[in-house]
Amino acid sequence: MIVNPFRALVSRLNKSRPRSEPARHARRAFQKRSRFSFSLTVLVLTLVFLFLPLFVIVVYSFNANKGSDFTGVSLVWYKALLFDSKNLWRSLFNSLLIAFSSAAVSTVLGTLAALGISWYKFKGKTYIQTISFLPMVLPEVIIGVSTVIFFSGIKLPLGLFSIFAAHTTFCLPFVFLMILARIDEFDFSIVEAAYDLGATERQAMLKVIVPAILPGILSGFLMAVTMSLEDFVITFFVSGPGSTTLPLYVYSMIRFGVSPVINALSFVMILGTVLITFSMRKFLKNFAAAK
């Protein structure tokens, strides 16, 4: 008989727990004291560390003064963002265009690759999954240098397409691994049941497999969009004239001082990210309830 080591460990720990009433009270008192003295402190400090810089950006986006002294509330920087920032909007458009296009391609390729790895058995399957981790552990400088050398070798001009190709290659392993983790939880006997009921391979794919792994596909797509939008190092190496993205544009502005217009744009992007996140969460919740 095969024994689950984790289940055996849990059973052993349960047996080793003190059963007396004083021991239970002592354990609960210790957990309560440690929870509020250490865990809560760490949680609060972590949240402050994460969200305080964002709060500062939001506050200074409404500052009437260009400097660090807060002199009053004003919407002047949002007006400048809307009407006097053509280059900034162009760089944002380039970033969004590259992010969504590279995320779409990497999601399609990653989904097909994950399905192929899970469905078929062949030699070297384990090595492919291991190699997929390399872009996650390699420094982006190495990836950027190797990518620009490869593009130079094949005579590919640097521009928006080179950034798109580099971001697709960089995001593909992340999407592949996220979808693969979702597929590993899928029961393929459902597909066999669909075949027995007369479904074709296309119907089984579109009506059984894809709906089951849709949360993983959407998560991989959003991860790819986020990674593409925030990437600076790889984009710095493979960009060319007329292909400035938002991170490159912000970097060029920081060299001459941070403009409050960037703060206004940051708040708009934070607000958009929050709305997309909650909308996606509600969609996945309704999708799970519908199933």
Pin down the residues of each PLM region:
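C-terminal transmembrane helix and the adjacent membrane-cytosol boundary/short C-terminal tail
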Residues: 1-28, 38-41, 124, 180-191, ...
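Membrane-interfacial helix termini and adjacent extracytoplasmic/periplasmic loops
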Residues: 23-25, 29, 67-68, 75, ...
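Interhelical loop and adjacent transmembrane-helix boundary motif
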Residues: 30-35, 78-87, 228-281, 291
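Cytoplasmic-entry segments and transmembrane alpha-helices of multi-pass inner-membrane transporters
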Residues: 36-43, 112-147, 191
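Transmembrane alpha-helices
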Residues: 49-54, 176-180, 186-188, 201-230
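Non-cytoplasmic
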Residues: 57-65, 175, 217-251
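Loop-to-helix entry region at the N-terminal start of transmembrane alpha-helices
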Residues: 87-94, 152-172, 216, 221, ...
